[in-house]
Amino acid sequence: MYGYEWTESNGIFRLTIDAHIEKEIRPVFKEELDFFGMNAYWDYPDTDNPLLWAEGIRRYVVNGEVVAEAKEGGYYTKPKIKIHRKGLTLTPISVEDLWKENAALLTGMEQRAITFIQKTYTEYAAKGYSFVVAFSGGKDSLLVLDLVAKALPPENFYVVFSNTGMELDETLHTIEKAKRHWPNLRFEEAKCHMDPLQSWDEFGPPGRRLRWCCAVHKSVPTILKLRELTGQYDVQAVVYDGVRAEESARRAKYDEISVGAKNINQVNCSPILKWNTAELFVYSLYHGILLNNCYRYGINRVGCTVCPLSSSWRDSLTNNIYSASVKPLLTKVEEYAVHQDIPTERRKKYIEKDGWRTRMGGRGLPNGGNRITESVSNDTLTFSFASHTQNWWDVAPVLGPIIEKNEARAVQLIDRREYTVSVDETTGLLYDVSLCTQPSARCGQ
């Protein structure tokens, strides 16, 4: 990971280990300038190339000089732009010149990443592991996919898109573009059987410390998809991901190879862990790697439409630019504010100032409170629900596959063991634990 220093050429910086500037930086395109009405102050052409850069997300710079700055913003509030230099004429940044200035370093980084991918493949293929590229449609996973496609034959890995059902429409378009861009790769989709609107009704909006959404709509569906692809219940898989240390203090502590960090049988390999955004964008722009259009509007992180970890900057841009995508889940947050008895005149401020993101537990939810009692008798585990909001058979697959079913009775595979399950409107939900003392011979199903 290198810092950068500005040259005298328009919009060109030089990556160097001795640089004093190590801020996160991103290219700024015409679409973002138009969105903020910058054409009233600056003159710039209609071009696909970047026109300037933004440091620290909100500070617009031309060769190190801050020429404008964005302040505030939220779901219902558009950021305000403070212009420091009016009458500015912008010209397209030469991607060719930007690459020439940094080609030696970036070519070396590319080769190190490809070698890393090939070495990990050789090591874990000998142990019988399967291989997957975790794909989200964002800049990081697009870069990793490009590197893995260069390093490995297409038949040696799958590309798994974890479709949470909460992505921006633009991201879904990017997924389809990727399939056309890499027609020889094996794309697969992992998706939860529950609709996000249904799960948000059941569990409430996810919070910063209560991020149930990742497990329900991403992690578990991905594991189930890997089992399906390999035919193995205890599937051992190497997952190439786009994790980068620059993204957060927590990720800065990650290793390039993490064994069992997310799943006991999963090895996460992060080829671009040490890449920063400056390096990523220069490489991607020069090599013509597919870019999600969200970045052209200034959205610095793609992902779910409403996320408890997103910034006010991203909240504002996504809701202003992709309001149709954001509305369904933002409506759920607004409903949660109503259940929290937040006065009408304060609700928008409550939502923008992160009130909902701090939630823990079920307080304030229509279905909140303790509704389940548990008892064990004669090798039978019984759950009694004071009330229920959906059919148990719709929820049960989260625990494991149902391999036999007959009306109100079924056989379910949980943790490699078979349980007989019955649902009785009077007695409750019964799991017979007496039949699960040995691993099931059907655990590959």
Regions found by a protein language model. Name each.
Residues 1-134, 139-445:
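Nucleotide-activated chemistry modules centered on ATP-dependent adenylation/adenylyltransferase
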